Amino acid sequence: MKVRPSVKKMCDDCKVIKRKGIVRVICKNPKHKQRQG
């Protein structure tokens, strides 16, 4: 899980979702997991 100020899709499988006010990226590649903070 990477925590960064701006989350971006890193590949075509990445999905940007908003959960409880937190912007997250979920992907089948675990290296691409991110959250904003």
UniProtKB/Swiss-Prot annotation:
GO terms under cellular component: cytoplasm; ribonucleoprotein complex; ribosome
GO biological process terms, semicolon-separated: translation
Short name of any one Pfam family annotated for the protein: Ribosomal_L36
UniProt superkingdom: Bacteria
InterPro entries tied to this protein: Ribosomal_bL36, Ribosomal_bL36_sp
PROSITE patterns, A to Z: RIBOSOMAL_L36
Keywords noted in UniProt: Ribonucleoprotein, Ribosomal protein
Single GO molecular function: structural constituent of ribosome
HAMAP family referenced in this protein's UniProt entry, alphabetically: Ribosomal_bL36
PANTHER family: 50S RIBOSOMAL PROTEIN L36, CHLOROPLASTIC (PTHR42888), LARGE RIBOSOMAL SUBUNIT PROTEIN BL36C (PTHR42888:SF1)
Similarity comment: family membership: Belongs to the bacterial ribosomal protein bL36 family.
Protein name according to UniProt: Large ribosomal subunit protein bL36
Organism for this UniProt entry: Sulfurovum sp. (strain NBC37-1)
Gene from which the chain derives: rpmJ
